[in-house]
Design a protein with these regions (language model features):
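C-terminal motif of bacterial Sec signal peptides marking the signal peptidase cleavage site
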Residues: 13-16
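Terminal connector regions
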Residues: 23-24, 120-147
Length: 148
């Protein structure tokens, strides 16, 4: 009986630890990120703590501004940001390299360079691909008004 309980305990421990091979806090290779995003057993959920649409106001042509979007891993698996890209070359996003443990918060940042951009309103998008459900791609938007 004791042997049976020991075997059951070990089996339960192994099942509980499945999927924990990606340690939160340790940077992952692009191959590891790609694998996690393509394996639905590793999917988690994300909550954007800030609005996903931001109004940055007036920006003088030539000025560089930074925008940040905070998020929280609300699932039960590590959150892995596979890729972060922008709608044009004037916006350079910064991709977090490490996984985020359940309950952990993080930030996606992007810099917008208004140099040489036409005056008036500009709307830019940042695309975040992650191992999330129900959607794997998240669109973050910011608006600026470029002035003299």
């Amino acid at each position: 009986m004791k042997k049976f309980l020991l075997i059951i305990s070990i089996a339960a421990g192994l099942v509980a630890c499945q999927g924990s091979d990606q340690k939160a806090g340790k940077p992952l290779s692009q191959e590891e990120k790609d694998k996690a995003v393509n394996d639905s057993s590793n999917f988690t959920t994300i909550q954007w703590l800030d609005s996903t649409v931001k109004e940055l106001g007036k920006v003088k042509e030539g000025q560089v501004v930074e925008v940040s979007y905070r998020f929280k891993n609300t699932g039960d698996r590590n959150l892995i940001i596979q890729n972060v890209s922008a709608s044009c070359g004037c916006t350079v996003p910064e991709k977090p390299d490490k996984p985020f443990a359940p309950g952990e918060e993080g930030t996606v940042r992007a810099k917008f360079d208004s140099k040489g951009r036409p005056h008036g309103e500009a709307r830019k998008e940042v695309y975040v691909n992650a191992n999330t459900k129900p959607e794997q791609q998240h669109i973050l938007t910011f608006k600026v008004e470029i002035t003299d």
